[in-house]
């Protein structure tokens, strides 16, 4: 029912590669701007994990320090089949937890420990640094050509398939809540299902624009977002040369909605595309509004910055930085089949 094979901006890659044969083939390191305060109610821990989900590490840490899971916070979830570093915070006002800075358990260990005056939460990160190893690459020249292409043009900013759960399971749960009226008491799970539903509808709109080759063009009535910012404005021209130049300079991007209570910003051609996509999803839209979700906007274009690569006998190591909330897999799918 829920196909996650979204159209690609640059066609199906010629090159085929093996990805994630080892957790070390997918390395992710959190990036943030600024410094921790060094004091405050929250102990902040830099964790390295391998072959575990973020939730599994949080539960393991909670057991070792004898704290409820609800006192441990993070800025984002990290993949299980990967080697990742991320920050966790423990609410422990005025408390010293002996030996916490050297704690470790199978699959994870603590690298750094300090304090901060705020707990970690989504929005704290500026981005993530990825180091990806592709093995048995069948067509290195096609891969290199595509890397050079996306350096300047970016890729469609889809939500990755992990957003939707195994086999789209989060979307099935969202359908049960939004359409069938099922009650879910767990606020975290409910929020996760709603996020999946909104991400799905965003991807549908973006995929329509990829098919029509307009995902990176400013249509009449488009909401335009400043790159690296939540600031938006509406394009009131059919094809603005100045906007095209700013898009080429990676300054702005057309944006598509994460549905909720609408402020009716989008107009014209862009609105027509959105309405066409939404037509068969009215029950989901009504349900999201009734549950108090507010419309938000997400850039259509994702730029992978600081791209570097090394090639060694059929193995390619890629390194790049993405903003928080972006998915490395949507970059990879434009480069190789895996």
Curated annotation (Swiss-Prot):
Which positions fall inside the TRUD domain? 154-303
One Pfam family it belongs to? TruD
Enzyme class, top EC level, equals isomerase
This enzyme's EC code(s): 5.4.99.27
The UniProt keyword set, sorted, is: Isomerase, tRNA processing
What catalytic activity does the UniProt entry give for this protein?
uridine(13) in tRNA = pseudouridine(13) in tRNA
Q: Which gene encodes it?
A: truD
User: HAMAP family given for it?
Assistant: TruD
Annotated active site residues, numbered on this chain, are: 79
Q: Extract the InterPro entries matched here.
A: PsdUridine_synth_cat_dom_sf, PsdUridine_synth_TruD, PsdUridine_synth_TruD_CS, PsdUridine_synth_TruD_insert, TruD_catalytic, TruD_insert_sf, TruD_pseudoU_synthase
Gene3D superfamilies tied to this protein = TruD, catalytic domain, TruD, insertion domain
Q: What does this protein do?
A: Responsible for synthesis of pseudouridine from uracil-13 in transfer RNAs.
| Signal peptide bounds | none
Protein name as annotated: tRNA pseudouridine synthase D
Query: Which terms in the GO cellular component ontology are assigned?
Result: cytosol
Q: Name one GO biological process term.
A: tRNA pseudouridine synthesis
- Record-level Gene Ontology MF annotations: RNA binding; tRNA pseudouridine(13) synthase activity
Q: What family does this chain come from, according to its entry?
A: Belongs to the pseudouridine synthase TruD family.
């Amino acid at each position: 029912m829920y196909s996650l094979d979204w159209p690609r901006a640059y066609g199906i890659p010629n090159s085929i590669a093996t990805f994630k044969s080892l957790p070390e083939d997918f390395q992710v390191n959190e990036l943030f701007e600024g410094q921790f305060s060094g004091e405050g109610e929250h102990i902040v821990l830099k964790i390295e994990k391998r072959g575990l989900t973020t939730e599994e590490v949080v539960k393991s840490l909670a057991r070792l320090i004898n704290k409820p899971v609800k006192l441990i916070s993070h800025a984002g979830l990290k993949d299980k089949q990967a080697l990742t570093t991320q920050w966790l915070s423990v609410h422990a006002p005025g408390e010293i937890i002996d030996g916490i800075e050297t704690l470790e358990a199978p699959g994870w260990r603590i690298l750094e420990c300090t304090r901060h005056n705020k707990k970690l939460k989504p929005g704290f990160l500026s981005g993530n640094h990825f180091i990806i190893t592709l093995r048995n690459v069948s067509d290195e020249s096609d891969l290199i050509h595509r890397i050079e292409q996306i350096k300047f043009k970016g890729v469609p900013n889809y939500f990755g398939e992990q957003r939707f759960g195994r086999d789209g399971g989060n979307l099935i749960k969202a359908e049960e809540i939004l359409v069938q009226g099922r009650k879910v008491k767990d606020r975290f799970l409910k929020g996760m299902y709603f996020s999946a539903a909104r991400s799905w509808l965003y991807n549908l709109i973006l995929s329509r624009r990829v098919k029509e080759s307009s995902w990176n063009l400013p249509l009449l009535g488009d909401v335009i977002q400043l790159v690296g910012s939540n600031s938006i404005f509406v394009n009131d021209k059919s094809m603005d040369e100045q906007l095209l130049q700013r898009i080429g300079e990676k300054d702005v991007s057309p944006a598509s909605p994460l549905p909720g209570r609408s402020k009716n910003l989008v107009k014209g051609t862009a609105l027509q595309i959105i309405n066409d996509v939404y037509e068969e999803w009215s029950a989901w839209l009504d349900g999201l509004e009734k549950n108090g979700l507010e419309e938000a906007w997400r850039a259509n274009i994702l730029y992978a910055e600081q791209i570097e690569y090394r090639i060694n006998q059929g193995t390619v190591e890629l390194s790049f930085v993405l903003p928080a909330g972006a998915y490395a897999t949507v970059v990879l799918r434009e480069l190789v089949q895996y």
